[in-house]
């Protein structure tokens, strides 16, 4: 039922973008952020939504830019999440899709890619948080971790090499 979506795709860092060149290196002059929906995380979200809808899921794709100023982006996206959950209480899966950014100590940037069906694809990493350190009042972290490991397993079985190791950390982000 399209009127009762169960999945929300959103982007706390909406303007994160990809280098549109097929190279194995990162060019420092490349702008890592874009307000163009065809070049930033909205485009990635559109592809995910299309696949989920083709599989029969009802999905909301929030394309709002929360990182016009980087600081405070998580608070702004959290407000939106709460509004969506109030409007659509049947939501079961909320995915905050980001571009991965790997930087070494010497500031070298790495592009994690895999070859899937003969084409280069950006690898995916799932982040799952938990209580600990300064993170408290996170009662569903075990459920989130189980979901994350199952999603990781399905993706890796379907597309070997696509998934980076799951990142499990004492952080909550907007995972509640």
Where are these regions (language model features)?
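N-terminal catalytic or cofactor-binding beta/alpha core of small enzyme domains
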Residues: 1-90, 101-106
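Active-site-adjacent substrate-binding region
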Residues: 140-166
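Active-site-adjacent mobile loop/cap segments within catalytic or ligand-binding domains
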Residues: 163-176
């Amino acid at each position: 039922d399209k009127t009762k979506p169960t999945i929300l795709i959103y982007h706390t860092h909406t303007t994160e973008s990809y280098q549109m060149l097929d190279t194995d290196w990162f060019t420092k002059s490349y702008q890592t952020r874009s307000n163009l929906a065809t070049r930033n995380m909205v485009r990635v979200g559109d592809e995910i939504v299309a696949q989920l809808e083709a599989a029969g899921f009802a999905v909301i794709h929030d394309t709002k830019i929360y990182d016009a100023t980087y600081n405070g982006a998580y608070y702004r996206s959290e407000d939106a999440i709460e509004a969506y959950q109030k409007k659509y209480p049947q939501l079961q899966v909320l995915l905050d899709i980001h571009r991965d950014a790997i930087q070494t100590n010497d500031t070298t940037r790495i592009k994690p890619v895999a070859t899937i069906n003969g084409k280069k694809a950006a690898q995916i990493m799932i982040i799952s948080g938990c209580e600990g350190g300064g993170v408290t009042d996170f009662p569903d972290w075990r459920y989130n971790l189980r979901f994350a490991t199952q999603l990781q397993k399905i993706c890796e079985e379907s597309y070997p090499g696509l998934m980076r190791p799951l990142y499990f950390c004492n952080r909550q982000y907007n995972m509640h």
